Amino acid sequence: MVIRVFLASSSGFVAIKKKQQDVVRFLEANKIEFEEVDITMSEEQRQWMYKNIPPEKKPAQGNPLPPQIFNDDQYCGDYDSFFESKESNTVFSFLGLKSQLASKAES
C-alpha cells in the first residue's frame, strides 16, 4: 500500500501550499511512506485524481483542490478530512493503515 498525496508544486495560493506542507510534514514526521504526485506536471495524473474522487466529495463548483490523499487507488480525503482525523488522532485509520502503536505492540 502506498499513500499518494496529490499536490500542486506551482500553486499561487499560499493557503494551498501550507495545507500541502502540513500533510507532507506530518507523514514525514511519522515515518509514513508516501509518494508525492504533482498534478501541475502531469495532465494524466490530474485527470486521474479528478476521476477517482467520489462524486459526493467533489465541490459543488469547480475542481477539487490539492492536497488530495489516496491509499493506492482508494480515496482517503482532502485536507479538511485529513485535519479532522489529525485532531481526533485517527490519521492512521483515515489513511487505511494500522497505527504505528499497534505495529510496535505486535513486534
From Swiss-Prot:
Main location (coarse class): nucleus
UniProt keyword Nucleus present: yes
Protein keywords: Nucleus, SH3-binding
Gene Ontology MF annotations: SH3 domain binding
GO CC annotations, alphabetized: cytoplasm; nucleus
Localization terms from the record: Nucleus
Signal peptide feature range: none
Motif SH3-binding: chain residues: 61-67
UniProt family annotation: Belongs to the SH3BGR family.
Name this protein carries in UniProt: SH3 domain-binding glutamic acid-rich-like protein 2
Source species of the chain: Bos taurus (Bovine)
Lineage, broadest ranks: Eukaryota, Metazoa, Chordata, Craniata, Vertebrata
